[in-house]
A protein has these predicted regions:
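Conserved beta-strand scaffold positions in the cores of enzyme catalytic domains, especially
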Residues: 72-74, 163, 285-287
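A generic structural signal for alpha->beta connector loops
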Residues: 67-69, 136, 160, 250, ...
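Alpha/beta-hydrolase-fold catalytic nucleophile elbow
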Residues: 75-76, 164-167, 256
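Serine-hydrolase catalytic machinery in alpha/beta-hydrolase-like enzymes
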Residues: 4-24, 29-136
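Conserved alpha/beta-hydrolase "nucleophile elbow" surrounding the catalytic nucleophile
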Residues: 55-57, 137-143, 258
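Primarily recognizes the serine-hydrolase "nucleophile elbow" in alpha/beta-hydrolase
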Residues: 128-192
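The feature captures the conserved acid-bearing segment of alpha/beta-hydrolase catalytic domains
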Residues: 42-45, 168-316
């Protein structure tokens, strides 16, 4: 069981007397229940990129500096009542009863995922308004922050600069698998022409219109479109206009997971990886044999640094 304060990044030196230390801004409560994020302003004079990372369940915002011209944003989840902990309010992006058996009481996740997705999209849009191109914005998170940010990213309509997830999972992955598997089963039988068909080479105008309708229906029922559509429907977000290409799936992604993780089982990380591959995503996957529920130091930090450097063509500090 993941207790309510185990999955955080390293903490900065924050106190009420010391609201800003080394470019890190302390959070304050705002009206919608969220706190202002901890923000690490760029060390360099120019602000060229932004990275937004979500903490794990029961934790709060961190300190994590690698790239001098990059602004780091560490949001803190609002307090939500956790059914698993006798409805005790804890910082969590969404409620969940059993991480390793997500189909049990899965409805608990929906409201939080809806709010968190809207919140993260708002942070992204604010950075775009601040002049940062969307292709220079990276999102991600640790543990439940990985799960929430992954779900939110897949519901976004634009390609991002990158995604970084550590020891997390994909909420409602089983339904995504079902969408993709249903299409595979259809592909296995669609070549069987049980009605024989016609040998006529000419098509009537009606037949051509019917073929066009079939093509449009294929786009509408594309398994990838349907899988992403399910995620949006699940949280009452509008579906994107029907088209063959879903821009956000072009986002390069990094996923890392400890093989010995007992809080978020390794197989859940593998499941997320496989679903994302099924969606056509570009995945950098790292498994850490001797790691539990955390991130690997220095290996995983180095891997993330290299991934961000390659994806955004950024030079990292040593």
């Amino acid at each position: 069981m993941e207790t309510p304060s185990e999955t955080s990044f390293p903490k900065g030196n924050f106190s009420s007397e010391n609201p800003q230390v080394g470019g890190l801004t302390q959070s304050s409560t705002i009206s919608n229940g969220y706190h202002e994020p901890f923000v690490v302003e760029p060390i360099a004079s120019s602000h060229t990129h932004t990275i937004i990372l979500l903490h794990g369940r029961g934790s709060n915002g961190p300190k994590f500096v690698l790239f001098p011209s990059t602004k780091w944003i560490f949001p803190t989840a609002k307090k939500r009542r956790a059914v698993l902990f006798k409805r005790m309010p804890i910082n969590q992006w969404f409620d969940i009863y059993d991480i390793n058996n997500q189909t049990y009481r899965e409805h608990l996740q929906v409201d939080g995922l809806q709010e968190t997705t809207a919140y993260l999209h708002g942070l992204i849009e604010q950075e775009i308004k601040n002049g940062i191109p969307v292709e220079r914005i990276v999102v991600g998170g640790l543990s439940q922050g990985c799960a929430a940010s992954l779900y939110a990213m897949l519901c976004y309509n634009k390609r991002l600069g990158g995604y970084v997830g550590m020891c997390g999972w994909l909420p409602f992955a089983k339904y995504m698998e079902d969408c993709l598997e249903a299409s595979q089963n259809k592909d296995d039988t669609e070549d069987d022409d049980i009605f024989g068909g016609s040998d006529d080479e000419e098509s009537t105008t009606f037949e051509k219109e019917e073929e066009l309708d079939d093509t449009q229906a294929t786009v509408a029922k594309n398994p990838i479109t349907e899988a992403i559509g399910f995620l949006k429907d699940n949280i009452s977000f509008p579906r994107s206009p029907k088209k063959e290409k879903i821009d956000v799936l072009e986002t390069p992604m990094f996923l890392g997971h400890g093989v010995l993780d007992e809080k978020v089982l390794f197989r859940l990380g593998e499941q997320a990886r496989d679903v994302l591959k099924g969606l056509g995503c570009r995945i950098t996957w790292k498994a850490y044999d001797d790691l539990g529920h955390w991130y690997k130091i220095p290996d995983e930090i180095d891997h993330i640094r290299d991934f961000i450097s390659d994806s955004l063509e950024l030079e990292a500090t040593s």
